[in-house]
Design a protein with these regions (language model features):
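Carbohydrate-active catalytic/glycan-binding domains of CAZyme proteins
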Residues: 1-138
Length: 138
């Protein structure tokens, strides 16, 4: 998924294994470019496909409670905040083999200018206000 912010383009991609249930290593990483066509780099200044690099900056990763955090989309709401929707497996949930949706606000690192979610983990079991959708367009 690609978004534009402050004249930069941010590519969000999933890395790791997905269809391994609670053993999934999926995570969302991000790279930045001056062009929508790339090349995209992490804050380590290495290209996302550089095997000696970090493959981008971590946005959201698996945790002790949620595995397989990936397949994302970004939503910008009327107050100009960005939100990320993605799926994951609740490891200790009633149906740990079923992927469930998550939504978290994207925060922006003041130093690297890269996006991430709070604690870089899914906000499971946390009460929070989500985005307000004013109008749906088809």
């Amino acid at each position: 998924y690609i978004i534009e912010k402050d004249n930069k383009f941010y590519y969000f991609g999933s890395q790791g294994t997905c269809l391994s249930g609670t053993s999934s290593t999926y995570r969302v990483k991000v790279g930045v470019s001056d062009s929508i066509f790339g090349p995209y780099k992490g804050s380590d200044k290495k290209y996302l496909d550089d095997v000696n690099g970090s493959f981008g900056d971590l946005v959201v990763a698996p945790s002790d409670e949620v595995a397989g955090t990936g397949h994302n989309t970004i939503i910008k709401v009327f107050d100009d905040r960005d939100w990320i929707m993605y799926h994951g497996y609740e490891i200790n949930g009633e149906n740990p083999t079923n992927r469930i949706p998550f939504i978290d606000e994207l925060l922006w690192d003041n130093d690297t200018k890269m996006p991430y979610v709070k604690n870089r983990k899914a906000s499971i079991h946390e009460e929070k206000l989500g985005p307000t959708i004013l109008k749906y367009k088809e």
